[in-house]
């Protein structure tokens, strides 16, 4: 079974994912920005009622591929992805965040809707919680001070793209060829299959 992080499939190139698979020691250690993001997420969570849990992980499987995705905040009626923003965020960061949400929502829409507290939190002493969310559950992106609702019109198209990317990550030549065609174009390629709008 080849296992991938959904976030990595959205934010990293095939070559980078392949390299880190062979050399995990080269991954960067958490930065101050990561710590700031975690604090921002906790602050957001403190303002939201009826939270089932934070960092609740789902798993999508297809043949010999397994893709894990972690949802920041899960409520009975919505899932919230939280991104901290310092200053004026570049457009690519918003697009990457929206695409990440669209991918996660697509997997949930296709029935991979069982979410459990991530193991790293359980190992820290947090209670393990689990929920089967509705496949059509609302998905919200909090991007700094802005909020967006994510809607997916063709979950299969989005999932199939990232399945092809995951398969390409298993071989250096396939990874190189995939990146040559798709690197930095993921949002453009998939933009017909999802939409988002600001909410208040």
Residue ranges of model-derived segments:
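Alpha-helix boundary/capping residues
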Residues: 13-17, 24, 108, 165, ...
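Metal-dependent nuclease catalytic cores that hydrolyze phosphodiester bonds in DNA/RNA
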Residues: 1-75, 200
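General helical secondary-structure elements
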Residues: 8, 14, 35, 53, ...
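Mg2+/Mn2+-dependent nuclease catalytic core
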Residues: 58-170
């Amino acid at each position: 079974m080849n296992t991938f992080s959904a976030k990595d499939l959205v934010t990293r190139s095939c070559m980078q994912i392949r390299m880190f698979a062979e050399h995990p020691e080269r991954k960067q250690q958490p930065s101050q920005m990561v710590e700031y993001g975690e604090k921002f997420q906790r602050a957001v969570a403190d303002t939201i009622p009826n939270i089932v849990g934070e960092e609740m992980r789902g798993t999508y499987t297809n043949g010999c591929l397994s893709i894990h995705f972690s949802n920041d905040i899960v409520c009975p009626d919505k899932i919230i992805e939280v991104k901290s923003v310092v200053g004026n965020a570049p457009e690519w960061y918003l697009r990457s965040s929206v695409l990440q949400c669209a991918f996660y929502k697509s997997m949930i829409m296709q029935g991979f809707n069982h979410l459990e507290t991530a193991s790293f939190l359980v190992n820290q002493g947090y209670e393990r919680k689990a929920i089967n969310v509705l496949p059509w559950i609302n998905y919200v992106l909090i991007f700094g001070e802005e909020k967006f609702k994510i809607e997916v019109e063709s979950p299969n198209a989005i999932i199939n793209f990232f399945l092809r990317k995951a398969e390409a990550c298993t071989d250096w030549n396939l990874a190189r060829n995939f990146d040559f065609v798709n690197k930095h174009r993921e949002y453009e390629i998939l933009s017909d299959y999802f939409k988002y709008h600001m909410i208040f």
